[in-house]
Amino acid sequence: MSESIKKELDKYIALISTLSGVLQIYLFGSYAYGEPGEYSDIDLLVVVEDSLDPINATVKINQKLVGNRTTPLDIVVNRKKDFSIAAKENTIQKYISDSGVLLYEAS
């Protein structure tokens, strides 16, 4: 992964992690697995508290990132409970839980 992508990820983590209720941020997809191509985007899964609405959380995350994106970015938001349940099945969440890169975890 290039230094510019690492810096961009650090910036995204710093911005997203300031939002209330953010528990974890995972990197998945081509950048996580070392296979980015010319047209690759950055794929992030954000796990939020069960009390939050994932759609509203997605809106707030995108508002935080306005003007701070230089690489295409795809964000998926899951409630903690939903992520935990889905990670036990043959789903993208299981793939992320098993092979994704945990970039942030709330203390």
Where are these regions (language model features)?
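Glycine-rich beta-strand-to-loop/alpha-helix junction loops that act as flexible
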Residues: F28-S30
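Catalytic core of pol beta-like nucleotidyltransferases
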Residues: M1-Q24, Y33-E38, E49-S107
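Short beta-strand->loop micro-motif that forms the acidic, two-metal-ion catalytic signature
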Residues: D43-V47
